[in-house]
Amino acid sequence: MNNKKFQVNFNNIPKLPKGSFGGGFGLLALGGVGLLALSSLVNVEGGHRAIVFNRFVGIKNKVYNEGTHFIVPWFERAEIYDVRAKPRSISSLTGSKDLQMVNITIRVLSKPKVSQLPAIYRTLGKDYDERVLPSIVNEILKSIVAQFNASQLITQREQVSRLIFKRLVDRAKDFNIELDDVSITHLNFGREYAAAIEAKQVAQQEAERARFLVEKALQDKRSIIVKAEGEAQSAQLINDAIKQSPYLVQLRTLEASKEIAHILSKSPNKLYISNETLLLNGFDLNNNQQPKK
């Protein structure tokens, strides 16, 4: 075999256009600068605040308000907090002063203290409300509910709510949390106590009904007595009047006859009525004589 040398003709390799490598590097550098500029901007939306973590000094004490702010990329990182008041319902099962089990639910409207956001992040993190509110609410509810009887929790509900609010506000300050409102939304008791309350209400209703019936009977009795006394007085007055003037009976008879005649006159049938029917047989109308005996 003939040994042939393998030779490469470099003249056949296509050459890159001049400046192509430099142009690609320029585009890459421009993209890096744009990305760097973009990562150095932090937008804080309305109702939010930001704090900055620095890799060298840790959390800065400055709180950034709403708007756009500059940070050093990679060296600094922004943490955004929602500082608007947020509602949260928390339930607790506790005992009252008279040893009744009470299931109470309160609604808490809370928000972080803006000036203390760096301290909140250092000690509690971003889920500060999850860490703090359930524990302090249960603590306060158990201590306050134990001061009242079960019936007082119902009749003095507003006072209990105000006391819970005052105690919770003072306790939440220890964790840099502000409370705008605290209200009792649900208040339930054990089955035995609920049955006892229902039985008591039924007994009270029955007692009220019995009291009403007694009062009504007394009123009816008084009415009958007053009516009887009135009829007796009326009869006595009529008797005295007849004794003094016999013509009173004739006047009453005439009034009755007039009423009978008026009623019969409206009848479509023609009727002929004697004096006896009209009660006029007792005296002479022309001579005004006394009634016949």
From Swiss-Prot:
Listed Pfam families: Band_7
GO CC field: cell surface; cytoplasm; mitochondrial inner membrane; mitochondrial prohibitin complex; mitochondrion; nucleus; plasma membrane
Stored SMART domains: PHB
GO biological process, one term: mitochondrion organization
InterPro entries (alphabetical): Band_7, Band_7/SPFH_dom_sf, Prohibitin
Membrane topology per record: Single-pass type II membrane protein
The keyword RNA-binding belongs to this UniProt entry's keyword annotation: no
Annotated localization: Mitochondrion inner membrane; Cytoplasm; Nucleus; Cell membrane
Family assignment from sequence similarity: Belongs to the prohibitin family.
Subunit structure: The mitochondrial prohibitin complex consists of two subunits (PHB1 and PHB2), assembled into a membrane-associated ring-shaped supercomplex of approximately 1 mDa.
The protein's name: Prohibitin-2
Organism: Dictyostelium discoideum
Gene name in the database record: phbB
